[in-house]
Amino acid sequence: MYKRQIYDIDFEFLDGVDRRPVGHGFQVVDHLTHNVYRGRMAFWADYYERLFNFREIRYFDIKGEYTGLASKAMTAPDGMIRIPLNEESSKGAGQIEEYLMAFNGEGIQHIALLTDDIYASVDRLRAAGVPLMKAPPSTYYRMLQERLPQHGEDESALEARGLLLDGTTENGQQRLLLQIFSATMLGPVFFEFIQRKGDDGFGAGNFKALFESLERDQIERGVLKVDEGAAA
């Protein structure tokens, strides 16, 4: 039996629109990433700790070729809500600075959605016309066996979809994280699509690769100005 919802009261369905469309396989929000002004990470970490009893679970200091960022991942007591805090690690027109200017202040940079079959989910996203971030170069996939020996994933399937793979295979135990990002969709805000196979991190191994790819995109768009001698 159909159970009435608040949407039945506050909204009217358009004619010819499926009221229960088939989704793309995503189940829950895995995490939200919060971009803050340089020097404000401690303020926001304290805010989440005092009001919601969050605690720090990860800290990253990512350096690109020209810019960098620091990231502190916070989690709720039950582990169900996770919010990494990002700030620019040095002055300049880095990715966080560009976001803050476009968003007119601090806010959520991206929303990560969890699936249990990222291959099928990405195929559905592409079929639906969802714009995804440019895939990494083929060298990324050729280096996977060196970085994650015996990871067990189909590398051709990963490359065909532009999926990133992270985690560990130490002691023959596979703890993997598969992820891909959309293009910006809500102003400067974008989405991350993720599948966890025993890994509860945030793709630290991919973090630097993603950061550098975004840095290259900034250079190509003319947002990040670099010295030609330094770029050579």
What name fits each language-model region?
Residues 96, 102, 109-186:
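Active-site/pore-lining binding-face segments in mid-to-C-terminal subdomains
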Residues 6-45, 104-113, 206-216, 220-232:
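N-terminal beta-strand motif that seeds the catalytic metal site of vicinal oxygen chelate
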Residues 1-2:
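Short, small-residue-biased leader/transition segments that mark boundaries at the very start
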Residues 186, 194-217:
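Low-complexity, glycine/alanine/valine/leucine- and proline-rich hydrophobic stretches
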Residues 78-96:
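Active-site-adjacent "gating/activation" loops or surface patches in catalytic cores
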Residues 21-26, 64, 85-87:
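Contiguous mid-protein beta-loop-alpha structural module that forms a pocket-lining wall or clamp
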Residues 36-82, 120-123, 127-130, 135-149, ...:
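Core segments of cupin and vicinal oxygen chelate
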Residues 29-33, 48, 54, 83-85, ...:
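Short, structured motif recognition centered on aromatic/hydrophobic residues
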